[in-house]
Amino acid sequence: MSPNIRPFIAGNWKMNGTGESLGELRAIAAGISSDLGRLFEALICVPATLLSRAFDILGGENILLGGQNCHFDDYGPYTGDISAFMLKEAGASHVIIGHSERRTVYQESDAIVRAKVQAAWRAGLVALICVGETLEERKSNKVLDVLTRQLEGSLPDGATAENIIIAYEPVWAVGTGNTATSADVAEVHAFIHHKMHSRFGDEGAKIRLLYGGSVKPSNAFELLSTAHVNGALIGGASLKAIDFLTICDVYRKL
């Protein structure tokens, strides 16, 4: 944790969920009571097909809604894509950009991530930008080099604590059940914090840094209590209300 920075818990449903899944969203909304909600901000990034219905359920009150990706152009002949403006109209306030699955499967470069961040800003969305190394890069002691490249290439000038959130998600831990040690997470988050402070000044020091990579109820307390960890980006555990709420409840103890 970091003093004076409000924690942020984000759930990423990925390509999971149909209308039947909205019952879990209702349960999450009911479980984040007013007293718990004061301790942190919550975001759920549902599939684009559920955004409008999810907004009708949540109303943008206790839980924020986000998209999982957006195109770098505002409109155009891009079959199957979705623009940041479309996400905004459907009820989103945030959008995940540069997730490791997008960077690896779809070969999205830092330049593309940067362009998507700028598109998100044009639409009035907060960009949740993901960075992280592969297992090979970690074994080769290139973690900080990779993060430096990604941070410099993916973040446009003008980043503030109001328009971006950064999630560190080691690629080797995403969806694998493997989790970085708290010492590894502390080292990386301190490094990212330093980079943000150096580039963006005092405003950069306020940018929230989330950890993402097989966060679950059994390891949430250790991870969320780590220095410079201001929250979590949660994948599979966000699909079940009981798991997501158990992670959120950690903030009652910190």
Swiss-Prot record:
Substrate binds at residues 12-14, 175, 214, 235-236. It is found in: Cytoplasm. Its EC number is 5.3.1.1. It is an enzyme of class 5 (isomerase). Involved in the gluconeogenesis. Catalyzes stereospecifically the conversion of dihydroxyacetone phosphate (DHAP) to D-glyceraldehyde-3-phosphate (G3P). GO terms for biological process: gluconeogenesis; glyceraldehyde-3-phosphate biosynthetic process; glycerol catabolic process; glycolytic process. One of its GO terms (cellular component) is cytosol. The active site is at residues 99, 169. GO terms for molecular function: triose-phosphate isomerase activity. The gene is tpiA. PANTHER family: TRIOSEPHOSPHATE ISOMERASE. Keywords: Cytoplasm, Gluconeogenesis, Glycolysis, Isomerase. InterPro entries: Aldolase_TIM, TIM_sf, TrioseP_Isoase_bac/euk, Triosephosphate_isomerase, Triosephosphate_isomerase_AS. Belongs to the triosephosphate isomerase family. The keyword Transmembrane helix does not apply. Homodimer. CDD domains: TIM (cd00311). It comes from the Bacteria. This is Triosephosphate isomerase. The keyword Isomerase applies. Pathway: Carbohydrate biosynthesis; gluconeogenesis; Carbohydrate degradation; glycolysis; D-glyceraldehyde 3-phosphate from glycerone phosphate: step 1/1. It catalyses: D-glyceraldehyde 3-phosphate = dihydroxyacetone phosphate. It holds the Pfam family TIM.
